C-alpha cells in the first residue's frame, strides 16, 4: 500500500521546471511572460551574455497575463529574453545569536564582506502579527537610560513608541543613547534610507563599540532600490521576532518609518497605483499597520519598539506622522526650538505621551510627573510676560512656583550622551524634585 502511494506521488509530480522570459523594462518595473508565481514571491533573473549574473527580484503585481517584477539591486544586466525562474517562496534570511554585533543588509549578509557564522536558522521576512488575544498586557517598565523618558514618559516592555522630529534635531543621538543604556537583552536597529556617511557615523559615534556588541544593525542606504529599503524594515522586524520567540526582551529601533513609506510609494507608483495624499499610494497605508503591529509582546517575550518619523517642516499632522501616531502606543516629540536652546535630548514632554505609563507606574510617580508638567506648562504659558518684565512676583502663586522651579526642571531634562541614568534613579530624582516623596 505504501509503495503504491509513493508511485502515485511520483506520477503526479511535475518533472518539468518552468521558466519565464523578460518582455520589457519600464522604469523600475520588469515585465515578464511567466513563470507562474504569487505576489511577494522571490524570482531569479538570469542576465544574458557572459556575465552569468543572477538578479533577485520580487513579484509586485500582474498585468494581463504578465507578471510585474521589481529587482532588489540594479537591473543593468537585464535584457529582453532574460530567463526568469520562480523560487516559490518569499525572501528568507538567516538568523541566530551569531548575528549579534554584525552590520548586515536586507538579505542578512554582512556589509564587511565576511562570511556569516554557522548555526543560523532561515526565517521568512513576511510574518503575521501576534494574535491580539495572545498578547499579554504591558505590566513591566523598560528602562531606556534617558532620564526624561524613564521618568515622564515611562515605557513598558512590549510598548511601541514613535519619535517624531524634523531633520537635525537629534534622533540618531537619542537612538544611540537608548541602545547603549537600555535594560533590554539586545538591540535590533534598522537604518532605512540613510545617507551612506551617516551609517558609519551612527555605528562608530552614536552606538559605539559597547552598543554594537549587543546590537544587530540592518542597513539599506538611500541610494539602494526602493525594494531593498522596504525589505530592510521587514528583515529587521523578522530578526527581532526571532529573538522575542526565544523568550528575550528585545529593543527594536527603526530610523525611519517615513523612508519605509517613501520606498513603498515608489513601488506602488511604479506598479500603477493611483497617488493619494501627498503622492502616497493606498498600499502605503495598508503596509504600515501590518509592519508596526508585528512588534510588541507575545506569550514568549517582548519587542519594545521605537520608530522615528521624519516630519516635513516640523508638521506633526502630515499623512505618515498622523497614521503612525494612530497605530503606536505613544509618541515622543523632539522640538527644534528646544534643540536651538541647547537642551538635549530635545524632548518636548508637554507634547509627548506614553499611553501605558498609567498602567505601569505608582500613584506617587504619576503625581510627580503631573506636577512636573504643570510647573513647566505654567512657566511656558507666562514666559513672554516674564522675559519682558511685565510679570510682578506675588501676582500668582502658581507662576511664582514655576519661576522658582524652572531652572531645576530644565537641568533635569538635560542629559549628556555618555551620562548614565538608571530607571529607578530617574523616578526617584523626579519625585524628589517635585516634593512627592513618601
Curated annotation (Swiss-Prot):
ATP binds at residues 165-172. Keywords: ATP synthesis, ATP-binding, Bacterial flagellum biogenesis, Bacterial flagellum protein export, Cytoplasm, Hydrogen ion transport, Ion transport, Nucleotide-binding, Protein transport, Translocase, Transport. It comes from the Bacteria. SMART domains: AAA (SM00382). Its EC number is 7.1.2.2. It is an enzyme of class 7 (translocase). Gene3D superfamilies: 3.40.50.12240. One of its GO terms (molecular function) is ATP binding. GO terms for biological process: bacterial-type flagellum assembly; bacterial-type flagellum-dependent swarming motility; protein secretion by the type III secretion system; proton motive force-driven ATP synthesis; proton transmembrane transport. Residues 119-139 are annotated as: Disordered. Pfam families: ATP-synt_ab, ATP-synt_ab_N, T3SS_ATPase_C. Probable catalytic subunit of a protein translocase for flagellum-specific export, or a proton translocase involved in local circuits at the flagellum. Belongs to the ATPase alpha/beta chains family. NCBIfam families: FliI_clade2, fliI_yscN. This is Flagellum-specific ATP synthase. The lineage of its organism: Bacteria, Bacillati, Bacillota, Bacilli, Bacillales. The gene is fliI.
